[in-house]
């Protein structure tokens, strides 16, 4: 059973470790995950909220950061442990974030290898509004969802 709760700054080391696992799955050694200005975990702790997904033994298997920007919900740093990807952890995190930041519009930046990685987001009603090619066969997708 997975439970969701707000993360605190004391979780930063575990979040960075989770971020590294996701990065290692997507990119060659030493290459950072793409992020835009203001989208670091520290930024979300300072100006928004970070949710974490925990197993019964308190192992962190997922996280997402969100905040309100110009009247819309802005999400980034959607991180799910590689062994738990595609098992609805992403969906649970996004649905919970919707309840915490109930805005009429959501924007999510999401790095992925291909559009198949976007399935959980598309299932929730997000649409791809922009796709930016990145090195190493990745793309940064900007997804939006109206009427949350």
Q: Positions of the model-derived regions?
A:
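Active-site rim helix/loop that mediates acceptor-substrate recognition in acyltransferases
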Residues: 28-51
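Conserved acetyl-CoA-binding loop-helix of GNAT-fold acetyltransferases
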Residues: 80, 86-99, 123
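Conserved active-site alpha-helix within GNAT-family acetyltransferase domains
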Residues: 113-131, 135-136
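Conserved beta-hairpin
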Residues: 48-64
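A short beta-loop-alpha structural element at the N-terminal edge
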Residues: 2-17
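Conserved GNAT acetyl-CoA-binding A-motif
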Residues: 101-113
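Conserved beta-strand in the GNAT
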Residues: 59-67, 72-79
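Helix-loop element at the rim of GNAT/NAT acetyltransferase active sites that forms part
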Residues: 17-32
């Amino acid at each position: 059973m997975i439970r969701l709760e707000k993360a605190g700054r004391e979780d930063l080391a575990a979040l960075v470790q989770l971020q590294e696992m996701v990065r290692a799955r997507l990119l060659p050694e030493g290459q950072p995950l793409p992020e835009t200005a203001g989208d670091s975990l520290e930024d979300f702790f300072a100006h928004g909220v970070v949710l974490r997904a925990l197993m019964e033994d308190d192992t962190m298997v997922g996280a997402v950061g969100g905040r309100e920007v110009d009247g819309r919900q802005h999400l980034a740093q959607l991180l799910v442990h590689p062994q738990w990807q595609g098992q609805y952890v992403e969906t649970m995190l996004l649905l919970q974030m919707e309840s915490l930041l109930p805005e009429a519009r959501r924007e999510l930046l999401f790095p992925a290898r291909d559009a198949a990685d976007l399935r959980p987001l598309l299932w929730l009603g997000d649409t791809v509004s922009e796709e930016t090619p990145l090195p190493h066969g990745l793309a940064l997708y900007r997804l939006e969802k109206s009427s949350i």
